[in-house]
Amino acid sequence: MSNTQLSYKDAGVDIHAGNELVERIKGDVKRTRRSEVMGGLGGFGALCALPTKYKEPILVSGTDGVGTKLRLAIDLKKHDTIGQDLVAMCVNDLIVQGAEPLFFLDYYATGKLDVDVAASVIKGIADGCEMSGCALVGGETAEMPGMYHEGDYDLAGFCVGVVEKSEIIDGTAVKTGDTLIALGSSGAHSNGYSLIRKVLEVSGANPTDLLEGKPLSEHFLAPTKIYVKSILQLIKQTEVHAIAHLTGGGFWENIPRVLPDNTKAVIDESSWQWPAIFNWLQEKGNISRYEMYRTFNCGVGMVIALPEKEVETALALLEQSGEKAWVIGKIEHLGEGEAQVEIQ
């Protein structure tokens, strides 16, 4: 038995550093506040009232991470936008059902807490919350010695939103003849990064190598686009039948999630050009066309199904919101033995 008096800090957990982090992020948390939020940081739980404008409010929840994009961000010491990625992955999943994000919580885990790094990450989370109009109401910062390599950390996010029951978007309204509108992505968003890192490895490319005048690192770490405010505006003023968020599984797996069983999406491949980074990945990794569309968004962040009569209004609204939007295809009847997504 040792006579040495031990403390939690001796075991690798610095409570003072955790408290310092809380003080550092208070301003970031404050700027995301919504009127429905009750209380501030430090409570055992966060309190949030339902917005009064809803007659029959339905809560919608989602949780996500950023995959191995985080590995790239850590290796390149780029911590200030990965938080936006985290928020985007959660709130974009809510908005496709018509839900307005209300509040967000994060989980940040590391072996040894670096206050500067953590504060930078959480500032990015607050930025994402501000962009999507949801409140950052709390989170968990876990310092766990022996669980992570030096300098590593992990992230997860959880978001709750609300939608009027009569206005839920679930794909059941999709009909043959509907038009499909695409919303442009900002890059690979937060999916396919294990393959991206493999391509970097086998190609011998350096993240500082230039592509269209920008380092590869800038292309790969471009923060995931948040579509919340644009889509909220769209669904207020047009009839939207379905929205698919193109994440893991790409076109082949995400679009069918919002289609009735008797319909298929026919995508016109000539309606857009892949951003240069996707052509680079396909060439350097010798990746098949099918695999590209299964792994990456290839420049398309969202696909929206709506009646043909709404197309002109929808495109104008989306353009006013700053989105790159175009007609990418249509909904047709699904024949026997056919796939629910065709890319022609």
From Swiss-Prot:
Biological pathway: Purine metabolism; IMP biosynthesis via de novo pathway; 5-amino-1-(5-phospho-D-ribosyl)imidazole from N(2)-formyl-N(1)-(5-phospho-D-ribosyl)glycinamide: step 2/2
Keywords noted in UniProt: ATP-binding, Cytoplasm, Ligase, Nucleotide-binding, Purine biosynthesis
Reaction(s) this enzyme catalyzes, per UniProt: 2-formamido-N(1)-(5-O-phospho-beta-D-ribosyl)acetamidine + ATP = 5-amino-1-(5-phospho-beta-D-ribosyl)imidazole + ADP + phosphate + H(+)
Origin superkingdom: Bacteria
Protein name, per record: Phosphoribosylformylglycinamidine cyclo-ligase
Main location: cytoplasm
Pfam families: AIRS (PF00586), AIRS_C (PF02769)
HAMAP family: AIRS
A GO CC term attached to the entry: cytosol
GO molecular function: ATP binding; phosphoribosylamine-glycine ligase activity; phosphoribosylformylglycinamidine cyclo-ligase activity
Family per similarity comment: Belongs to the AIR synthase family.
Signal peptide (from-to): none
Native organism taxonomy: Bacteria, Pseudomonadati, Pseudomonadota, Gammaproteobacteria, Pasteurellales
InterPro entries noted in UniProt: PurM-like_C_dom (IPR010918), PurM-like_C_sf (IPR036676), PurM-like_N (IPR016188), PurM-like_N_sf (IPR036921), PurM_cligase (IPR004733)
EC number: 6.3.3.1
Matches recorded under CDD domains: PurM (cd02196)
Keyword hit for Heme: no
Subcellular locations according to the entry: Cytoplasm
Gene Ontology biological process terms, A to Z: 'de novo' IMP biosynthetic process; adenine biosynthetic process
